[in-house]
Structure formats: structure tokens, C-alpha cells
Amino acid sequence: MSDLSGASRPKLCPGCRLREPAGESDMLLIPEGALRLAGPGRKIVERCDGQHTLDDIVRELKAEYPTAEPSRIETEVNTFLERLHQKRVIDLES
């Protein structure tokens, strides 16, 4: 079970970073290889800086995608960050 809450401040773990776009799909480089980021994945990971809370990330994405269903954004951000946490790609600060 994840420790993810609205006040959690996700931060990329050491050795994990975004690959700068070179005309291809966005990639998150991790010590074990790379993860392809789809949809708003890059925008979520960019906010995993230890400063933004989960609530901040969800609020900013709702503003950026005003036609998307708000509850879907919240669910997808939560699920995505839980997966990254399980893979030890992000730490959760409080």
C-alpha cells in the first residue's frame, strides 16, 4: 500500500531523470532502463520536484486540461504516481 496522500510531495529518486525530447516520445530514464511516458506523463513527472504536493499536481493538470473529467485526472495522477512509487522511481516527502 502506498503512502500517497494529497499532502505528499513526490520527488524523483537519485538516478532517475527525464530525457530531453529529441523528436521522439518522452522517456523517463531510471537505473534499470527507461519508461516511455504517454499522455500527460511528462507533465506529471516534471512536477515531481519535492515542492509540488499531489494536490498541487492534480489542481494544475485540471487547469491545463479544462475539458477533461476532473475525477479522471485525479484518479490517473494517483495511479501513475503510485506505480512510480512502487517501482522506486519517486520518493514521497511530507
Residue ranges and their predicted role:
Residues 34-94:
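Long, charge-rich, low-complexity alpha-helical segments
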Residues 1-32:
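Long, low-complexity, charged/polar intrinsically disordered regions in eukaryotic proteins
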